[in-house]
């Protein structure tokens, strides 16, 4: 009713204050309304209500009389009154309200009744009445002894109330009391279909979760409700403990399979990390187009299934899963966006914008350190584009501007430029394999591995090229070839590659660095597979090393390899933690914490986060004081012995909090607050790790509050905090071209112009911000942030754990570890194909994703959208939906490569 309507004749009765209090719907006259405040409630009732009240009282009295023949009509009338009182949702129905005072009397009458139909009938009415009384679950008690008639006839509110009581009652019964659970189950079987039919799917799920009978869902779900139910179940997964979370996923998966929604089922099987199930779903689907779509999803997730050759379209499916076309599809996107022109590092640094009084800061020195930075930047910016201006034309000139290990990283950056282009890339790298410089050769070997990252090839070129160098006399050559194999076969768990690498760890010629890199590479190849050989070899290597060797900074990679092998495996690490008990401190705590956090990566496990916070709050004082005395003697020894201090495992704990919490929004928000406290009050080792944790929790998602925090700590007094903060800024904005971040980094470059180490970090961050000219992402989550790619997490962890000792590893000689990020690089694009896999440009709406869990109807899933034509880029937290009715996507989540089908019902 519009505002002015109040002065006109009352068309529609507006609820008066008295009605709000007393629940009457009649509109009393003005005089009555004035007096309503001071009169007693009894007298507020209108004529009609008074009549109703008297009638109900008479019915109750009639039940108390001796004449049993009157019971039936009285009960029928009571029931009619209760049911016919259609009421607003906000107030209690009138008959129930007037019957409340007689509740006790009705119960007495019920007790005195002779058993039979009338008694059951009375129980029904008391059950409904009990809903308004806060009693001891009497609603349920009387329902069970009642006449068992249709639940629906009493309305939704009653069903809801009953469901709540069933859940409470169930939890109080022991498993032993099976008999008493039976009637409850019968009741549940009535409630579920009712809820399903009345848009209350999530209430049905809640009830079944409470009584741990989720499997009952499957048979009551119909075509219209399944999507909502599964969305609700999967969104609850983060909030329930083991093993219920996998039960929910398996239930949703069963529902999807019931309705032949194979892509959705596959996604859940990947969440469960159950490869047999993945294969089963893939092979049981008989529709080739859907199979191709699933192959795209598996390729994106880094999973390869060995199909039998007689499968229809075997070659196509294998090719899609192997990501063979990734490079050509990516370049098609680049051409579409018109960004093929190679960039040089100066385009990124924008030195001309720095207002120095003495010319640009870049022009002063051509130092090896800055050239190394430029090699990385050049690789990051032109990643996967296949051409650049420094290396692809005449690389030797550039390579010799670097020295020693710098040459290794510079040569390897060629692999990043040629990323995913196995056939074309290897020929360009080949000439460097014959260089006279070991460093360049080693870099070229690493480049071969990088090119093959995430792409499978029948001929296994990486294995063929690199296997000869794994036990080479020169440790430099070993490094490039081993790390290269790790990147090329990450996530494949290939036995032949592992048997080649594992012996290197125990080889007498291997330096600690080589042993560490080998453990890393094996961890990446066997990521999340609990491979027994990898576990035993790494453990054996740790046991064999002396205490001094374990103090070497590269020793940290051994437990990291162990952790990666058990990534996301939870309980499965108990045996390893027990085996590590024999190692001496401080290495033991470091290794334990690292393996522990890897096992719970992305799980959002609150209890683990609490344990880690305890570790963070420990203090190590006594050692500091002794150190002061020994400082002078130790100065020279100190260079190599980084993790020797007691607090090293605290840094890992901080990273671990981010690693565990990054899986779900609420956990990540809480972790953010914690990091704020740690930065202000933590020990130095803690503070150094916090920027890295911030980077991990928000990879490729430049949120302003995180950028501001990092920007503040990029001027910190502790140089390692500032190095890590600057690098973290690059990680947070990786591949976004974020203008605000770019400006911040340019200011930092000026501020640190005289400090080569900080400047090196600023350059790295600038390169990352413009990763792949803004088309790639490092975020390990995909498919609407539901799936965590283990290979990507392995790559990120490799880099971040190395940054815990930034001075000796990244700023020392092992900057090649930065290429671990290659494992996490993925194009953040949406490309649409027709059923023949030809590119099909269609218009799509791209906007911020909206959470629609548990909402009624068909709510909008995106907000603030713009319409583009595919191929398009998707930023963090964005979602796409088709803007035309003409096509239907084979998978509901539009991300990566999506196959579209003609809509049969579309009329031109």
From Swiss-Prot:
Which family is this protein grouped under?
Belongs to the proteasome subunit S2 family.
Keywords in alphabetical order, please. Answer: Acetylation, Phosphoprotein, Proteasome, Repeat
Q: Where is this region: Disordered?
A: 1-52, 623-645
GO MF entries: enzyme regulator activity
Subunit comment = Component of the 19S proteasome regulatory particle complex. The 26S proteasome consists of a 20S core particle (CP) and two 19S regulatory subunits (RP). The regulatory particle is made of a lid composed of 9 subunits, a base containing 6 ATPases and few additional components including PSMD2. Interacts with RPGRIP1L. Interacts with CRY1 in a KDM8-dependent manner.
Query: Which species is this UniProt entry from?
Result: Pongo abelii
Q: Which residues carry this modification: Phosphoserine?
A: 16, 29, 147, 361, 363
- Designated name of the protein: 26S proteasome non-ATPase regulatory subunit 2
Residue ranges, compositional bias (Basic and acidic residues):
24-52, 623-643
Function according to Swiss-Prot or TrEMBL: Component of the 26S proteasome, a multiprotein complex involved in the ATP-dependent degradation of ubiquitinated proteins. This complex plays a key role in the maintenance of protein homeostasis by removing misfolded or damaged proteins, which could impair cellular functions, and by removing proteins whose functions are no longer required. Therefore, the proteasome participates in numerous cellular processes, including cell cycle progression, apoptosis, or DNA damage repair.
């Amino acid at each position: 009713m519009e505002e002015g309507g109040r002065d006109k004749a009352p068309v529609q009765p507006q609820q008066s204050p008295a009605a709000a209090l007393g629940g009457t719907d009649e509109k009393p006259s003005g005089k009555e309304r004035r007096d309503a405040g001071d009169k007693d409630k009894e007298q507020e009732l209108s004529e009609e209500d008074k009549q109703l009240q008297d009638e109900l009282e008479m019915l109750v009295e009639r039940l108390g009389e001796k004449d049993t023949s009157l019971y039936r009509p009285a009960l029928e009338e009571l029931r009619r009154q209760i049911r016919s009182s259609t009421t607003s949702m906000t107030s209690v129905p009138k008959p129930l309200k007037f019957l409340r005072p007689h509740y006790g009397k009705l119960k007495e009458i019920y007790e005195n009744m002779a058993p039979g139909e009338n008694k059951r009938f009375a129980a029904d009415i008391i059950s409904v009445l009990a809903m308004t009384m806060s009693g001891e679950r009497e609603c349920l008690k009387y329902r069970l002894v009642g006449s068992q008639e249709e639940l629906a006839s009493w309305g939704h509110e009653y069903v809801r109330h009953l469901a709540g009581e069933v859940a409470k009652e169930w939890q109080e019964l022991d498993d032993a009391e099976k008999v008493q659970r039976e009637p409850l189950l019968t009741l549940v079987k009535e409630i579920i279909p009712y809820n399903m039919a009345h848009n209350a799917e999530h209430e049905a799920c809640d009830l079944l979760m409470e009584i741990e009978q989720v499997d009952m869902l499957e048979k009551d779900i119909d075509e219209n409700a399944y999507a909502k139910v599964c969305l609700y179940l999967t969104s609850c997964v983060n909030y329930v403990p083991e093993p219920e979370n996998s039960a929910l996923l398996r239930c949703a998966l069963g529902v999807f399979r019931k309705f032949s929604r194979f892509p959705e089922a596959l996604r859940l099987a990947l969440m469960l990390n159950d490869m047999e199930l993945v294969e089963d779903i893939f092979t049981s689907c008989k529709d080739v187009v859907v199979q191709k779509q699933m192959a795209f999803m598996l390729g994106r997730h880094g999973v390869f299934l060995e199909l039998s050759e007689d499968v229809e379209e075997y070659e196509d499916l294998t090719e899609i899963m192997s990501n063979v076309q990734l490079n050509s599809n990516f370049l098609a996107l680049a051409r579409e966006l018109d960004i093929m022109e190679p960039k040089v590092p100066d385009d990124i640094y924008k030195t001309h914008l720095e207002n120095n009084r003495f010319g640009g800061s870049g022009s002063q020195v051509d130092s090896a350190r800055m050239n190394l930075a430029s090699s990385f930047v050049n690789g990051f910016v032109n990643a996967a584009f296949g051409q650049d201006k420094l290396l692809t034309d005449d690389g030797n000139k550039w390579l010799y501007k670097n020295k020693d290990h710098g040459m290794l990283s510079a040569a390897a950056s060629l692999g990043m430029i040629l990323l995913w282009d196995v056939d074309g890339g290897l020929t360009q790298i080949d000439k460097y394999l014959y260089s006279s410089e070991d460093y360049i050769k080693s870099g070229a070997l690493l480049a071969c591995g990088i090119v093959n990252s995430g792409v499978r090839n029948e001929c296994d070129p990486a294995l063929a090229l690199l296997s000869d160098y794994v036990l080479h006399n020169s440790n430099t050559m070993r490094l490039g070839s081993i790390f290269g194999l790790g990147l090329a076969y990450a996530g494949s768990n290939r036995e032949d590659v592992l048997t080649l690498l594992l012996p290197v760890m125990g080889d007498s010629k291997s330096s600690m660095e080589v042993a560490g890199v080998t453990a890393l590479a094996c961890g990446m190849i066997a990521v999340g597979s609990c491979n027994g050989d990898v576990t035993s070899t790494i453990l054996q290597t740790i046991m064999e090393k002396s205490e001094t060797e374990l103090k070497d900074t590269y020793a940290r990679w051994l437990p990291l390899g162990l952790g990666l092998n058990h990534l996301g495996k939870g309980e499965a690490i108990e045996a390893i933690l027990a085996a590590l008990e024999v190692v001496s401190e401080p290495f033991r705590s470091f290794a334990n914490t690292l393996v522990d956090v890897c096992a719970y990566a992305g799980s959002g496990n609150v209890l683990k986060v609490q344990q880690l916070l305890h570790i963070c709050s420990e203090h190590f004082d006594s050692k500091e004081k002794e150190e002061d005395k020994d400082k002078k003697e130790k100065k020279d020894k100190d260079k190599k012995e980084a993790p020797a201090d007691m607090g090293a495992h605290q840094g890992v704990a901080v990273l671990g909090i981010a690693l565990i919490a990054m899986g779900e929004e609420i956990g990540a928000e809480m972790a953010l607050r914690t990091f704020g406290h740690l930065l202000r009050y933590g020990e130095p080792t803690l503070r150094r790790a916090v920027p890295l944790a911030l980077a991990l929790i928000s990879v490729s998602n430049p949120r302003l509050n995180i950028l501001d925090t990092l920007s503040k700590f990029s001027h910190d007094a502790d140089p390692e905090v500032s190095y890590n903060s600057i690098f973290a800024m690059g990680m947070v904005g990786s591949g976004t071209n974020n203008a605000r971040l770019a400006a911040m980094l340019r200011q930092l470059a000026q501020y640190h112009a005289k400090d080569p180490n900080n400047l090196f970090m600023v350059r790295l961050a600038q390169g990352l911000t413009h990763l792949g000219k803004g088309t790639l992402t490092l975020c390990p989550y995909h498919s609407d942030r539901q799936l965590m790619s283990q290979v990507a997490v392995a790559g990120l962890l490799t880099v971040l754990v190395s940054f815990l000792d930034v001075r000796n590893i990244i700023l020392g000689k092992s900057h090649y570890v930065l290429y671990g990020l290659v494992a996490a690089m993925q194009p953040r694009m949406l490309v649409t194909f027709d059923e023949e896999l030809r590119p099909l440009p269609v218009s799509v709406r791209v906007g911020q994703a909206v959470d629609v869990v548990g909402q009624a109807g068909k709510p909008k899933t995106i907000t603030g959208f713009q319409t583009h034509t595919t191929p398009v880029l998707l930023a963090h937290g964005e979602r796409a939906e088709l803007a035309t009715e003409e096509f239907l996507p084979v998978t509901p989540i539009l991300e990566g490569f999506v196959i579209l089908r003609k809509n049969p019902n579309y009329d031109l």
